[in-house]
Amino acid sequence: MRLTDMADELYTATTDLPGGVRAATAKRGGVTVTRVEIAREGLEKPRGRYVTLEVPSVSVLDERDAEVIEPAADELRALLPPEGPVLVLGVGNRRVTADALGPRTVQKIFVTMGAGRPPVKGIRPVAAVAPGVSASTGLSLQQLAGALVREVRPTALICVDSLCSSEPQRLGRTLQFSDTGLCPAQPGSSKHLDAARLGLPVIAAGIPTLMMAQEGKDLVVTPRELDSVIAHGAALLGAAINRALQPRLSIAQLCWLVG
């Protein structure tokens, strides 16, 4: 079995698909969008919808690249409830570059909830947090996410995390969104978060930043420009999330508000 978080590496529109799986690819400007829908259990990926967007290397993009941000925001918005508060969770270890995408993305989220911030008509309530790793907090990701959900009471949770690919040419060049929750491909991962555990829609968002080396199961491969992939990828994902949640604001306005 291929070790990958990317649904379209397992199920493509050009191959024979197992029963209960549909895949389709379309072009939107310079972005290739692939949608995979899994309608039954028992396959390599959980049942649900997956969307991947093939883009130029995110290391050369930023939060103002509308050609990528607009289609990404549209695809993400389609997976979310139409209204209500949203909590964005930055999963990962900010001290390990390949795993820092989630925490770095949270820094780019337009937060509209908080003490002293009255509701604004037309602006969706959004909170964002990077809970850290259990070795630092003493609490599991499931415990922290559960406590945050009970306190904030969002209508949906967006989990941002670094992803694993099985194809080196896709590292730093693909965005993926899914409504299946966070279900890492790596065996023994403690990052599983889904609707069954938390009682609300859980959307996963990420960019592949590593792959497992074939020569050894304990070795990983990362792109040469990893620092730029994380920095620019976090800005790009943050902009797409902001645009998906605040469609009344332009990309330029959101960039100015985030700073």
What are the residue ranges of the model-derived segments?
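N-terminal amphipathic/basic leader segments beginning at the initiator methionine
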Residues: M1-G48
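An N-terminal, well-structured beta->alpha segment
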Residues: R40-L80
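Short glycine-rich or small-residue beta-strand-to-loop segments that form or flank ligand, phosphate
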Residues: E54-P56, P85-V96, A128-G132
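A glycine- and small-aliphatic-rich helix-loop capping segment at beta-alpha/alpha-beta transitions
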Residues: P71, E75, T97-G114, T174-C183
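Gly/Ser/Thr-rich loops at beta-strand to alpha-helix junctions
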Residues: V91-L101, A135, S162-S166
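Anionic-ligand anchoring segments at beta-strand to alpha-helix junctions in alpha/beta enzyme folds, i.e.
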Residues: L101-A135
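A structural-propensity feature for long, helix-poor, extended segments
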Residues: G122-V149, R153-L157
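A structural signal for small-residue-enriched, beta-sheet-centric alpha/beta enzyme cores
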Residues: V129-A130, Q143, C159-G259
